[in-house]
Amino acid sequence: MRLLYGIRAHHDKIWSVSSHQKLPLLATGSSDKTSAIFRLSETEKFPRVTTLDDTHTRSIRSVMFKPPIDDTVVDENELLDPPTLAMGSFDAKLSVWQAELPQDNDEDMDQEPREIWKQERKVVERAAQWELMAVIEGHEHEVKAVAWNCHGSLVASCSRDKTIWIWETDPDTLEEFECISVLTEHQQDVKHVIWHPTQNLLASSSYDDTICIYRQEYDDDDWGCAAVLNGHQGTVWCSAFEHPKSPSASETTVRLVSASDDLTVRIWSTSKEGSETNHDALPSSIKSSNEMQWDQECILPSAHTYPVYSVVWSSVSGRIASAGADGKIAVYKQTDGVWEIEGVTSAAHGVHEINTLAWSKLDDNREVLVSGGDDGYVNVWE
């Protein structure tokens, strides 16, 4: 990999980074109690768009952009779905922020059907103000991760209190967040949660060395644990689903990659038919059970010498990247069904640990890998 740019984002640890699915925006969460948003433009040297602060009293441990409401091509005259960011903090609270779309008073607006394009340009060029939409309370201890589902209607949060909360909202208004489920499967601190990119399937990673998979019960709207993935011999710090659009994805299989204190990165899989929640299409013998069969598919080639904190799966290239306490970033590629290490970058943040990774796209549509470390830097890699 080649380092494109190092962004001095914070003066304290960076715990989390998240890239917007459509706009060239990157958000960070830091021990300095703030989140910064940057424009992913190499030609402009990755300028800061805004800093979100004065909301949390302790470290911001997790940030995640909400997926756009409609991920299809829209009419040019329709309004942009405003970028929306969720944060989780060690102060046990969540917050949700949204960019206020600038009003365009150009006289030629009616003659130029480029409303969305104009709004996008202003949002990423620091013309938009960011508004605090909600502060969400419920957890008893530090929030370790937040995640939006693919529809932007559910937010999952996990905590040191060993619980996972699922919050429901109207993605159009974000007026209120109602807790619809509290999941208590884990026996220890829950480190991470992530939704499947196209299904309401949730994965959680924990200090108890396991990964739990959740979905709604077949007979009602309650959420329940559908599978417990055992195999790691240490804390599971992070997991990521493979996107169905990934070049390596199978039409019949759903896969998940996980990273752990045991120095390993593992891939797990289940049948796609068993993961989908179309109850009417299932045989009556299966409808009565919410259980799923997940198997460990493989352990990726060894690349790390200390705990692995972050793992991400590219929907564009199908590559997996991992990073952690040893300061290394490893990139893996699957060829003819076999996973190989494509490259390892050592001392990617000098002597500092790496806490977070994200696959992102620049404003010129190039895919890059973004890393955040204890040094307060966001590094952009190609």
UniProtKB/Swiss-Prot annotation:
Protein's UniProt keywords contain Transmembrane: no
Pfam family, one: WD40
Keywords: Cytoplasm, Nucleus, Repeat, WD repeat
One cellular component term from this protein's GO annotations in UniProt: cytosolic [4Fe-4S] assembly targeting complex
Domain of life from the UniProt record: Eukaryota
GO biological process terms on file: iron-sulfur cluster assembly; tRNA wobble uridine modification
InterPro entries the UniProt entry points to: CIAO1/Cia1, G-protein_beta_WD-40_rep, WD40/YVTN_repeat-like_dom_sf, WD40_repeat_dom_sf, WD40_rpt
Family stated for the protein in its record: Belongs to the WD repeat CIA1 family.
UniProt-recorded name of the protein: Probable cytosolic iron-sulfur protein assembly protein 1
Gene giving rise to this polypeptide: CIA1
